[in-house]
Design a protein with these regions (language model features):
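A short secondary-structure junction signal
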Residues: 138-139, 149-157, 175, 186-195, ...
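Non-heme Fe(II)/2-oxoglutarate
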Residues: 3, 7, 14-30, 197-198, ...
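Active-site rim elements
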Residues: 111-116, 220-225, 247
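Short, conserved beta-strand element in jelly-roll/cupin
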Residues: 169-185, 230-231, 261-263
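Short, structured patches in soluble enzyme cores that scaffold and shape functional sites
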Residues: 141-144, 166, 178-182, 194
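Acidic, His- and aromatic-enriched active-site or binding-groove loops in soluble protein domains
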Residues: 155-173
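Double-stranded beta-helix
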Residues: 183-243
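Non-heme Fe(II)-dependent double-stranded beta-helix
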Residues: 1-47, 51-161
């Protein structure tokens, strides 16, 4: 997969199976639709990304309370626990040492509202139909990105901030993101290049580097394909992480975001983050 998984034709061939009929069970729903399911799935197939998902307000509040009450880890380092106070709007918390991000790692499964999403019938339906196979939970993350830090190039690359890249976590993957705080242009919105999961310059497929400069990408993709996703707390979207994407640096307000990732194998995802047990 390390080599072949980078090639668009290989990944597209894996999705030649017909869209399956999915019976995800009767788990308690946590995600809601703000648009028709067919419309969301059509946009996802075409663009590699689609919004129109949201969390219930009471679930957003519960996840926020969990985040304020639970230690997270500066720079995703388990030896650097910190707490984020509820009144902290911008900048890293005390003890974070100016870290750009703080990740909750393995402990998020103790939050019932998060754990419920892992078997959410709507998310499993969308993921299984997009992946053309029963979706397998790969990873789930909850993390802060802080404004007002002086992150160097190494940190930006490590934590995928202002650094367009694609993920290679499985032969096929689908991620769901939910903003747990309000995210506008000044709070580090997620960025995605529309259609880049299926349309890619050959040189971007043959290199061993998953990251590409914005200059290189702008020479191939038109400006209108560079999307910034903003929305209130609870706003959600589905994304094929093989498309080029990045977080952006918050300039005025911190961002708390939840990710749920599905794939097609049980291969564990490498990286400095926790995974569901």
């Amino acid at each position: 997969m390390f080599l072949l998984g980078r090639l668009v034709p290989v990944r597209e061939a894996l999705r030649l199976l017909p869209v399956p009929r999915v019976h995800p069970g009767f788990g308690e729903p946590g995600a809601l639709l703000d648009r028709g399911l067919w419309d969301l799935e059509s946009g996802l197939e075409r663009d590699g990304i689609a919004d129109g998902l949201r969390l219930r307000p009471e679930d957003v509040r519960a996840i926020q309370e969990f985040a304020f009450a639970t230690p997270c880890f500066a720079a995703a380092d388990p030896s650097r626990p910190v707490r984020v106070p509820r009144d902290l709007v911008s900048g890293p918390p005390a003890g974070a040492g100016g870290a750009l991000v703080a990740d909750y790692r393995d402990g998020i499964g103790t939050c019932p509202e998060i754990a419920r999403l892992w078997s959410d019938p709507l998310l499993l339906t969308i993921a299984s139909r997009y992946l053309r196979r029963p979706a397998v939970l790969k990873r789930s993350r909850l993390w802060w990105t802080f404004s007002g830090t002086q992150a160097d190039a190494a940190d930006l690359s490590t934590f995928s901030v202002d650094h367009f890249h694609y993920d290679l976590d499985d032969w096929l993957c689908l991620k769901f993101f939910f903003y747990i705080t309000d995210v506008d242009a000044e709070a580090g919105p997620h960025a995605f290049i529309r259609g880049s999961q299926a349309r890619r310059r050959l040189s971007h497929q043959l290199t061993l580097f998953k990251g590409q400069s914005e200059k290189s990408l702008s020479a191939f993709y038109p400006p209108g394909d560079f999307l910034l996703l903003t929305g209130p707390a609870g706003y959600g979207f589905a994304e094929d992480p093989f498309g080029f994407h990045t977080g952006t640096t918050p300039t005025r307000r911190n961002r708390l975001i939840l990710e749920v990732e599905y794939g097609i194998t049980k291969r564990r995802v490498a990286g400095p983050y926790g995974s569901p047990r």
